[in-house]
Amino acid sequence: MIRILGEGKGSNLLEDVKEKLEEIVKKEIGDVHVNVILVSEDEIKELNQQFRSHDQPTDVLTFLLMEEDVYGEIYVCPMIVEENAKEFSNTFEKELLEVVIHGILHLAGYDHEFEDRKSKEMFEKQKKYVEEVWGEWRSDPSEDSGPGKR
C-alpha cells in the first residue's frame, strides 16, 4: 500500500497512479506499506544534510524503515523535480514518476552508486516502469487525467 503525504504540485498525479505504483511495490518488495512524502526545498535540504552530509536540496531521498506499519519512506521535493524536468527536457509529471519509481527500487534493494550490474538493472527497470505508468496515465479517458490536467 502507498500513502501519499503532503500537498501541492504532483499530489494529484500520484493519487491518479497510486494503484499502478502499488503494483510495482508489490512486485519488487512484497505486500508492504510505503509513504511518499512531498516536501519543500528547505525540508529536503535538511534531510539531505542530516542523513547524507550533503548541504544542498535534492529531488528524492529514500529511507528503509522496515517497521511493522511502514516499510519505507520516499521524500520528494516537487520544486527540484520541476527544475530537473526542465534541465532534462522532460515534463514535470514524467520526471515525478521517475523519482518515485527510483525510490521504490531503492527500497527494493537496488543501488546505483557502487554496483555496475545492479545499477544497470535498476535503471532498466525504472525506465520500463515509468513507461508503463506514463502510458497508462496518458491514455486514461477521464477528464481529470493526462498531461496538462494538473
Curated annotation (Swiss-Prot):
Domain of life of the native organism: Bacteria
Binding site for Zn(2+): 102, 106, 112
Cofactor note: Binds 1 zinc ion.
Pfam families: YbeY (PF02130)
InterPro entries: MetalPrtase_cat_dom_sf_prd, YbeY, YbeY_CS
Gene3D superfamilies xref list: Metalloproteases ('zincins'), catalytic domain (3.40.390.30)
Cofactor: Zn(2+)
Keyword Hydrolase: yes
Subcellular location as annotated: Cytoplasm
One of the protein's GO biological processes: rRNA processing
Disulphide linkage map: none
A GO term from the CC aspect: cytoplasm
Keyword Nuclease: yes
Gene Ontology MF terms: metalloendopeptidase activity; RNA endonuclease activity; zinc ion binding
EC number(s) on file: 3.1.-.-
Keywords: Cytoplasm, Endonuclease, Hydrolase, Metal-binding, Nuclease, Ribosome biogenesis, rRNA processing, Zinc
NCBIfam families to which the protein is assigned, alphabetical: rRNA maturation RNase YbeY
Family of the protein in this entry: Belongs to the endoribonuclease YbeY family.
Function as written in the Swiss-Prot or TrEMBL entry: Single strand-specific metallo-endoribonuclease involved in late-stage 70S ribosome quality control and in maturation of the 3' terminus of the 16S rRNA.
Record's protein name: Endoribonuclease YbeY
Organism: Thermotoga petrophila (strain ATCC BAA-488 / DSM 13995 / JCM 10881 / RKU-1)
Encoding gene, per UniProt annotation: ybeY
